[in-house]
Each structure stands twice: as structure tokens, then as C-alpha cells.
Amino acid sequence: MGTRALGAIELIPRRKFYDYTAKYSANARTKHIMPAPLSEKKYKEVLFLAKKAHKILRCRGITRSDFRFFKNKFYLLETNTQPGMTKLSLVPEIAKYCGIKFVNLVEWIVKDASYNR
């Protein structure tokens, strides 16, 4: 959110593949763990990497960077410049955990989009 990384969440799908159904169906029961269960050092590292990806890619507004954590290293999968904003989407869930109401999140996105850069 701007220059701030809101947080990291871990997803544990109960399906073989993390596909559309696993992402967007309440019946899929993908487990969301917030905050991601990482050491303080690793948590700060993944937030730093997300901010770095946002900056290097010259992104604006809200982005969501997806990582795999394997053998104690983070691997960037993608940076999503238009993350979902549904009831099951991750950005609103992470923002809520950080104390940011959905209406305030949307308000910030609209205001940020209106700035000329």
C-alpha cells in the first residue's frame, strides 16, 4: 500500500492444485494463516522482497506479490498489479488484519490512482 507492505499470509489448499476453485470457492476450504508463521527475520525479509518487487517493476497503488518458501528461501512467483477485492480475496483480508477497513482500503486505492506521477 504505497511504500508499505501490509503483511504476509500463508495459504494451505486442501485440493491437489491451487486453482480457480481453491481460490474463489468458500467450499474449497483453503486455509489462510495470518500472519504467515515465519520467524521475525524471515517475515521482515518477505515484506522487504515484496516492496522491492513493487519498486523495481515501477508499480503504483496496491500490488500483491506471491512467493514460494522452499529450503529457507523465498522465490517470487508473480507480482499482481490488480489483486482481487472480493470477500475471499487476500488483499482485503490482510488489510483487515492490519486494522484497515475495506471502505478505507478502497478509498486509499481511488485517491492514490488519482495522483499524477
Regions found by a protein language model. Name each.
Residues 1, 55-85, 95:
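Conserved metal-phosphate-binding beta-hairpin within the catalytic cores
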